Amino acid sequence: MVILVLNCGRSSIKYQVIDMEAQSSKLLAKGLVERIGLPEGDLTHKPVGKEKFELHQPIPDHTTGISLVLQALTDPVHGVIRSLDEVKAVGHRVAHGGEFFPESCLVTEQVQEKIRSLFQIAPLHNPANLEGILSIEKVLPGVKQVAVFDTSFHQTLPATNFMYALPYEYYQKYGIRKYGFHGTSHKFVAREGAKLAGLDINNSKIITCHIGNGGSITAVLNGKSYDTSMGFSPVDGLVMGTRCGNVDPSAVTFIGEKEQMSYAEVNNMLNKQSGVFGVSGVSSDMRDIDLAYDEGNPRAILARDMHYGRIRKFVGEYAAEMGGVDMIVFTGGVGENS
């Protein structure tokens, strides 16, 4: 059975094609569609065992982008399947499932409506994730679709860890609480790490560190998420590439008032102008920060020390919270390569 996996962003589509009939799942191809909606779009298709294929043309929307992906998958030269009939299901990464979805689920009209209802608290991700689902309905009608939510794994957090000490009515009215993200990654690496280490996942204390341009850390107690560094949004927690992580809210309101910033401008500052980029003034990429660090750039030194210091702080906090730790697992671009 061939599965197509999609991660749809606002102007991009990441995809993988996996053969699940093999004794162990086998990657057939992966690729990336970029610059959707811009005058010149790009498709990079990487079939396993074949030459990489690139296409450059306008890609006005996600439906067009996914159609180009399907054409590449069945191309006589660059393709990996003979017919689209071989694609039996499509899996979608969906950033935010709120409190609706403790597990992955088949996509129905009701599921689509719940994803849509979360647009306000996940405006950067959920609209594009839903667009991918709707596009598949157009180009692969009748194929089963599964939504895999970043937030699902963290639905086991105890209330003491997911509630904020704000007036309780805001949780009741607006769902203001810690949701956590990167849950699919944390769940997978905790289980794989336990297998490699010979640990019983159901009787273990594991700390998983997903460190990339965005990053989060999770305390996994007996196989379940017990605490996690991201909060109501992915801006909370670690010092990330362009996201600030933990910060006193009063500092944010003070800056907004002094700079006469709108809500959108404040949100942009926290999400896109802060983190190691904001502190260093050099880059959001840790490879660039490392080079500047080695050159003695004082702000790059400060940014890197803050970045790694916050990781150590959360690891220590979660070890104390669980009463010890059996294993620490690193994943993500920085976590795996730094």
For the regions a protein language model found, what residue spans apply to each?
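Phosphate/pyrophosphate-binding loops at sites that engage ATP/ADP/AMP, CoA/4′-phosphopantetheine
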Residues: 72-88, 193-200, 315-326
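Short beta-strand-loop/turn "lid" adjacent to the catalytic site in phosphate-handling enzymes
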Residues: 73, 77-125, 146, 152-161
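N-terminal glycine/serine-rich phosphate-binding loop of ATP-dependent small-molecule kinases
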Residues: 1-98
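Adenine-nucleotide phosphate-binding core of ATP-dependent small-molecule kinases
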Residues: 268, 275-279, 286-322
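Glycine-rich phosphate-binding loops at beta-strand->alpha-helix junctions
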Residues: 326-338
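Oxyanion-binding "anion nests"
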Residues: 251, 256-282
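Glycine-rich phosphate-binding loop of actin/hexokinase-like ATP-binding domains
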Residues: 153-258
